[in-house]
């Protein structure tokens, strides 16, 4: 019999951005229950809008950054950008900004040497690899601009993989 090596236990990270909720809705609770209950981490990339969303998501292992539409209670709790380590990977997180040049180049400059850059703001889902980096935007749960409603799932094991879940 041949031998094989099993993939080490992968880490599941649910990624939200641009929820733009003034209060937690039943629909958001249902989405979170479905996708986050077995997640190892939950990341929110800003524009939570209300601190009630931040408070609600703290029932999960939560990381996050603030966005341009967040109220002061959220901005005081969260940085505008941060880098976390998951397994052997460095992951940069920011909300993003109204940038009209080469967005990927601007993000690359902001997060030198990371394996992945997670960002929101555009409400457009994106999963692309370029120059050895993963660029990942989960889109928006409630107001996708042209790309529909979505969230993201990162799977971290031997590799770092991103997937968009259409809602």
Predicted features and spans:
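Binuclear metal-dependent phosphoesterase catalytic core
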Residues: 10, 16, 86-87, 109-113, ...
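N-terminal active-site segment of His-dependent metallophosphoesterases
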Residues: 2-56, 60, 70-80, 88, ...
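Active-site neighborhood of phospho(di)ester-bond hydrolases with catalytic His/Asp-centered motifs
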Residues: 15-17, 41-47, 63-68, 93-95, ...
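A short helix->loop->beta-strand "cap" motif at the edges of active sites that frequently abuts
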Residues: 60-62, 132-133
């Amino acid at each position: 019999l041949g031998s094989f090596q099993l993939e080490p236990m992968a880490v599941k990270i649910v990624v939200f951005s641009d929820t733009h909720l003034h209060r937690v809705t039943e629909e958001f609770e249902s989405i979170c229950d479905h996708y986050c209950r077995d997640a190892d981490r939950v990341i929110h990339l800003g524009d939570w809008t209300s601190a009630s969303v931040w408070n609600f998501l703290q029932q999960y292992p939560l990381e996050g950054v603030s966005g341009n539409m967040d109220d002061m209670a959220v901005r005081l709790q969260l940085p505008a950008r941060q880098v976390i380590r998951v397994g052997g990977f460095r992951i940069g997180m920011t909300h993003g900004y109204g940038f009209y040049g080469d967005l990927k180049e601007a993000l690359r400059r902001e997060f030198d040497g990371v394996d992945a850059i997670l960002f929101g703001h555009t409400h457009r889902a994106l999963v692309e690899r370029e120059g050895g980096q993963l660029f990942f935007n989960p889109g928006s749960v409630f107001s996708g601009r042209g790309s529909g409603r979505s969230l993201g799932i990162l799977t971290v094991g031997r590799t770092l993989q991103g997937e968009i879940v259409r809602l």
